[in-house]
């Protein structure tokens, strides 16, 4: 269970600081529109594979030029030298958070963490938060066993990868809300947990399998919530973001 001190600190954070809006959009114009509308309600914007592939580094620069913070959700998974080089490039772009796959192994994780901190120090700027992707939220127990070939329960595998990430010097992990408690027990109260698979009550689950509401995830001990379609695909994205922020503010 998360400690009382940790929960109190997270509650003190303004609601917007806990919200990462996923910019899963096909082009720069669509991203600009969302950032302009949602900046008052988002502490960070996630630039993922679709947006980065379509717009390249300009996607990151666009958010930064508007005063936003960027989570580069590119899930690097390659040999250590390649991942280290890619991580350095993201530091030079000015991202605030980035991720790599825990499945890449300890040497890859260590290389990425070292590269991020060395590059940030060379540029005389704060190092981005570096986190590891664990089990994708689109996978359930059956898919993990039959398709990926991992026999452990999802929660056990997530906790195992979270411990590996911590040992390798990373700041935290990406994991579904269902595994937050296991990660907290394994890795402690300061470990960063970024949680996708968050859906307001009554909203469409989409392709997510292991989900919670924003309030439930925060009560479990999530550090940040990644929220995409419930905000960006809503008839009124601003109203949707406001409603989620209001729900977060009620968490005690």
Swiss-Prot record:
What's one Pfam family here? OMPdecase
The answer to keyword Protein biosynthesis applying to this record is no
List the active-site residues: 75 (proton donor)
Annotated residues for binding of substrate: 24, 46, 73-82, 137, 199, 208, 228-229
Q: Which residues form a coiled coil?
A: none
Q: Choose any GO biological process term that the UniProt entry carries and state it.
A: 'de novo' UMP biosynthetic process
Keywords, alphabetical? Decarboxylase, Lyase, Pyrimidine biosynthesis
Recorded metabolic or biological pathway in which this protein acts = Pyrimidine metabolism; UMP biosynthesis via de novo pathway; UMP from orotate: step 2/2
**Which reactions fall under this protein's catalytic activity?**
orotidine 5'-phosphate + H(+) = UMP + CO2
The GO terms describing molecular function are: orotidine-5'-phosphate decarboxylase activity
Q: Which GO terms describe its cellular component?
A: cytosol
Q: Which SUPFAM superfamilies match?
A: Ribulose-phoshate binding barrel
Q: Give the enzyme's EC designation.
A: 4.1.1.23
Q: How does it assemble?
A: Homodimer.
Note the NCBIfam families from the entry. PRK00230.1 (NF001273), pyrF (TIGR01740)
Record's protein name: Orotidine 5'-phosphate decarboxylase
Q: Which gene is annotated as encoding this protein in its UniProt record?
A: pyrF
